Amino acid sequence: MNIDDKLEGLFLKCGGIDEMQSSRAMVVMGGVSGQSAVSGELQESVLQDRSLPHQEILAADEVLQESEMRQQDMISHDELMVHEETVKNDEEQTDTHERLPQGLQYALNVPISVKQEITFTDVSEQLMRDKKQVREPVDLQKKKKRKQRSPAKILTINEDGSLGLKTPKSHVCEHCNAAFRTNYHLQRHVFIHTGEKPFQCSQCDMRFIQKYLLQRHEKIHTGEKPFRCDECGMRFIQKYHMERHKRTHSGEKPYQCEYCLQYFSRTDRVLKHKRMCHENHDKKLNRCAIKGGLLTSEEDSGFSTSPKDNSLPKKKRQKPEKKSSGMDKESVLDKSDTKKDRNDYLPLYSSSTKVKDEYMVAEYAVEMPHSSVGGSHLEDASGEIHPPKLVLKKINSKRSLKQPLEQSQTISPLSTYEDSKVSKYAFELVDKQALLDSEGSADIDQVDNLQEGPSKPVHSSTNYDDAMQFLKKKRYLQAASNNSREYALNVGTIASQPSVTQAAVASVIDENTTASILDSQALNVEIKSNHDKNVIPDEVLQTLLDHYSHKANGQHEISFSVADTEVTSSISINSSDVPEVTQSENVGSSSQASSSDKANMLQEYSKFLQQALDRTSQNDAYLNSPSLNFVTDNQTLPNPPAFSSIDKQVYAAMPINSFRSGMNSPLRTTPDKSHFGLIVGDSQHPFPFSGDETNHASATSTADFLDQVTSQKKAEAQPVHQAYQMSSFEQPFRAPYHGSRAGIATQFSTANGQVNLRGPGTSAEFSEFPLVNVNDNRAGMTSSPDATTGQTFG
């Protein structure tokens, strides 16, 4: 070893550039290991300048010699080197001894000054060698003790002759056969299998495997965030989080997908991208190829799936597929993908993608199989493929409605294109209005939106129909008592226009009945909220329904079945739909309408039910006259509003005089009691007429009113109205009556038992007769809908 070092120093110091390169080549071949080549390069870089001082050359030479000895000691005392290395070293040493004379010839040609330098160098080197040899035994013993452990890195020679560093992992986990460098790493890994977490947090009792994880977790409790972003000032517990956050400011994307070369700013996004885009795609291709191989083998053997196999559960059907395809680990990873497969032997349709709110997007992407897989069948049936359009349909989550898919006996590329799948995905597209109506919007004033809507899907649930019937019944029975809905007729803020009269509708719409229109001219109402007394009992409504459904006179053309009638209790005011009428039909409407409340609608609803009860009574004289028809009155309403959303029915007008709410329901609880035109109820609050009402043009005496009422009672075949003493309308109240109602021509007419009341109610002193003066022109229940053939009252 000493001879080699001396020769190396000699050739480097005395020779020229060419000699230095040749000596460097000799050192590479004759060195003990390839590390000597590295040392030769270092010597060349250090000693390339010929004018270096003598002491610097000696110091550099000493450093190189120490590094060589250290490397040689490590290699000699480690018995993990390959045997070829030692054989190669012996051969290289013999080659260096053969080439020594050539090297000495070059060294003899140097000048005298250089020779003196060489001899001086040899003496100094010898002194340094002697000192190191004295210390060598102690250093070797220490190094031997240290190297008895497993070395961190081992120098090895690769197959191509290059050097490599190998890290031995001698500590192997007995659970999963994972190897580790040290026992510490192994014990830390074993905690994962055993579940042991020795480090516990003192504040939240969380446990951790490593201590640094506990220390990092404790910063959450203390609120310490030592790492701060320079640009935005955000602070972080971990330095990694801060560095990741800084990439949002700089826009740096250091991570790249190895498949599509797309860059990402975070590693988790790269992994997610690979998992979603590339790994699943590769797995699908592998699965498709395996299924294609299965199909060819089954076609060659003439195998066809039996219906018994189709009736098996999905997991049991997948087991023989896994065994036959030989997918051991990939089948476990593909569980999420195989759940979407429906025994499809060919990938004709890609799996349907699930979107939010359980909407299914049906993707019909027909993939062409291989040429060896049923090519003749595909050519024959390719002209018949008509994939349905992409539609959005809210699917039903019930598994009981999913019909089992029946496979065809002869397996072909189009065996999975079945009628059941087509019916599952292909539905009619509904328009926006029908969608809004079908979603249960109670505030849309439509009459027959369910009857006019699109047909129901094939796999619709029957619970939806039950729910809709229940909603109809609840809306019919509780329309008057539901406090959550707002029935405020905000008419007081609307000024009366000269050609358009604002109207509010609070009515129950039926196929054969009319609605009641509130005249805004007469809505000078003072409302007192008394919700406890304004609720119509359910018994009363049920009695009415029973009465309408089971009439004794055999006239069943009027159906009040809850299941067949849709009740809309919303209020719509649309002044743009109100047509203009002539000036002769206008009545002076100078007073502004005041605001009303829910009680207003309740009372109108009660009055409408009472009038409907009068019309459908079995002894009522109105049912015996076939000439009655829907009645319109063009003299009382300046411009009758046309509500386009309520089936274009003709409405009877009902002027409302001033009254106060708070009355109980004026309906009778049983249908066999008497019904009368003036709604008389047992109310605790009278409805006095205010004396400051607008004076009108003409008035009708009370005597005319009494004559017409008595003539009506005589005209009836079987009178069902109770006889009330109407003499109270005589002289004591005639004068204030004429003074207060002089503006409107109050008209009373009788025709076939109907009374058109356009007169006022009682005065303030009659508390025993709380007359609600809202009787409209009753619509006749006849079969002819033509209004011109009927009788017009007024």
From Swiss-Prot:
Free-text tissue specificity from the UniProt record? Expressed in heart, lung, kidney, skeletal muscle, liver, brain and spleen.
Gene Ontology cellular component terms for the protein in this record? nucleus
Q: Which InterPro entries match?
A: Znf_C2H2_sf, Znf_C2H2_type
Q: Which GO terms describe its molecular function?
A: DNA-binding transcription factor activity; DNA-binding transcription repressor activity, RNA polymerase II-specific; double-stranded DNA binding; RNA polymerase II cis-regulatory region sequence-specific DNA binding; sequence-specific DNA binding; transcription cis-regulatory region binding; zinc ion binding
Q: Where is this region: Disordered?
A: 298-346, 574-596
Q: Where are the zinc fingers (C2H2-type)?
A: 171-193, 199-221, 227-249, 255-278
For bias type Polar residues, the affected ranges are 574-588
Q: Which residues carry this modification: N6-acetyllysine?
A: 607
Identify the keywords attached in UniProt to this record, alphabetized.
Answer: Acetylation, DNA-binding, Isopeptide bond, Metal-binding, Nucleus, Phosphoprotein, Repeat, Repressor, Transcription, Transcription regulation, Ubl conjugation, Zinc, Zinc-finger
**Which residues fall in a compositionally biased region of kind Basic and acidic residues?**
321-344
Lyase is among the record's keywords: no
Where in the sequence is Phosphothreonine found? 194
Compartment(s) where it occurs, according to its Swiss-Prot or TrEMBL record = Nucleus
Assembly state and interactors? Interacts with HNRNPDL. Interacts with the 5FMC complex; the interaction requires association with CHTOP. Interacts with CAVIN1.
Indicate what this protein is called per its UniProt record: Zinc finger protein 148
